[in-house]
Amino acid sequence: MKKAIFSLLLMTASVIGASAQGSATTAQNPQDVDVLYAKNLLAVGTEAPAFPALKKGTWTVLDFWATWCPDCRREIPTVKEMFQKYGTRAKFIGVSMDTDKQKLDNYTQANGVEWEQYSEFKKWKETQISKDYKISWLPTMYLINPEGKVVYTTVLAERMVKKLAEIFPEK
């Protein structure tokens, strides 16, 4: 009888543990990442705040990132693929939160980052652009239409790939 009760308790503990682990990893689910980290970004339809590299008249992908950010570095291959596929139809601007120009230049050269880079070379939370665009997570991406309005925001490059495919369907 004791073995049966012990076995039942052990099974219950295993089920509860597995259930708890499942809910803890839900935040890791790509569908939920934007809910967690992109919720306070500029709203769709908002005029994109001006900065020297941003020009109206073309679609623009803004990629807020830093060389010291592991998630950003992991997304670079996806951003490179986007740039290669859509770089003639949209302008890509990397908005770097790096403080050292030489480190940024070395990283972009070593990793084949060919799109324009913009940086204030200040600490992330001290930059005007991060305040203007309400950046609280890196990486963060914005899609700006030719009229200068925000049309999409995400913290996942793979989601931006899907959005660009909707806007620029293959012929």
Model-derived segments and spans:
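Thiol/disulfide oxidoreductase modules built on the thioredoxin-like
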Residues: V113, F121-I167
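Short pre-active-site segment immediately N-terminal to redox-active cysteine/selenocysteine motifs
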Residues: T58-T60, F64-W68, W137
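Conserved hydrophobic packing residues within short motifs/helices of P-loop NTPase cores
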Residues: L62, I93-V95, Y142
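Conserved redox-active cysteine motifs that mediate thiol-disulfide chemistry
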Residues: F64-E81
